[in-house]
Amino acid sequence: MSVTDSEHRHKLIPLLGPAFVAAVAYVDPGNVAANITAGARYGYLLVWVLLASNIFAMVIQYLSAKLGLVTGKSLPALLGDRMSKPARIAFWIQAEIVAAATDLAEVIGGALALHLLFGVPLLWGGVIIGAVSMALLVVQGEGKQRQFETIIVGLLIIITLGFLAGLFVAPPSPSGILGGLLPRFQGTDSVLVAASMLGATVMPHAVYLHSSLVNDHEADELGPSTADSRHSSGHLSRLLRATRIDIYWALSIAGLVNIGLLLLAAAALAGQSGTDTIEGAHTAISSALGPLVGTVFAVGLLASGLASTSVGAYAGSEIMNGLLHVRVPILVRRLVSLIPALIILGAGAEPTWALVVSQVALSFGIPFAIIPLMRLTAKREVMGEYANTRTLRAVGFAIAAVIVALNLFLVYLTLTGQG
């Protein structure tokens, strides 16, 4: 490796990190439930759905990050600048509902993990998850963005090891994996499961947040003066290159985790009953592969809940600030957003049912995040020379159309009782 390559790499490393925080949204408890269900019911059939979803996510997250870097503003802030006050409030309300639904899934997932590991009652598990996430947010709130990112990356490593460990005990079938790369379905139910997988993968709050993360990270690493002079210094091209690398590696890891969960279920749980809940999947994994693998799986679920609920609260704060120009202390927001999840846990609602409801709410919110993102990144008056090319516009809108159509289909099937 030449000295020049070494210097470039040395300069590149400090710019990496935001995508790994956003990637946590792609390995939250909702993904665990969707991917385990897909593998247990249909074996390797829907591997292609996860592969396509991951490619879609890479494009969407890059556009969000590019929007933030080029404009210096987050997606919510840009929308807030272009909307009337009533429109801003209405948009904020739907975004907050989506944020609450996201938090619901993540807190419940973490509480379930504590219950599986230590027998902690679900309500108290939710309280513990909320308290730990608040501690993580204190780090971020004190301006220690790099430390916050390091903690989240550490949790992402635990998630990866926890969810993929079972594959060493029950290796998937290579021919099954190859067969799963061929796009096809097996009846209407498999379409519903595929829509659920896609809905659990592309998360609205990750789209909103990434455009803010890149600016917070740059200001923390390089200082506000460097961040503000990005255009005049020619720094932007290097930032965008670093962002593409950041997203590629972060979402490749997230995609590997999601596909690994499906492969684990296909190899060890196919045809077994009771695996359509996280508790049932844990029991089946422990029974089929041994209690150690079951414990490691639960540890991965715990890390997933802790990381994703912290990132979700961070996203909610940025959404409110961008749309309403109001910055409520993030710990106050964390307390308020925790209440719905604790009420549901305290009421004794079935956790998997709550996860399903939360995924439907997320499906409603996806078009409101993706369509404005595509429109803004295509406008030269917003993006200048970095506006999407015709090819990227076509690809972006095609991805948006597929995601929105599948999520609306999921909502329809769920509301009509067919899901």
Description of each model-found segment:
Residues 156-182, 191-212, 373-381, 406-418:
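Hydrophobic alpha-helical segments and their helix-loop junctions in multi-pass secondary transporters
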Residues 92-96, 117-139, 157-162, 327-343, ...:
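Transmembrane alpha-helical segments of multi-pass small-molecule transport proteins
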Residues 86-88, 123-126, 292-294, 298, ...:
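Loop-to-transmembrane helix boundary motifs in multi-pass membrane proteins
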Residues 22, 49-82, 91-97:
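Juxtamembrane transmembrane-helix boundary signature
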Residues 2, 34-39, 62-87, 139-146, ...:
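Flexible loop linkers connecting adjacent transmembrane helices
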Residues 57-70, 214-229, 252-280:
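Extracellular/periplasmic helix-exit of transmembrane alpha-helices
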Residues 1-30, 86, 157, 193, ...:
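Membrane-interface "cap" regions at the ends of multi-pass membrane proteins
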Residues 56-61, 86-106, 114-140, 199-200, ...:
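Helix-loop-helix module between adjacent transmembrane segments
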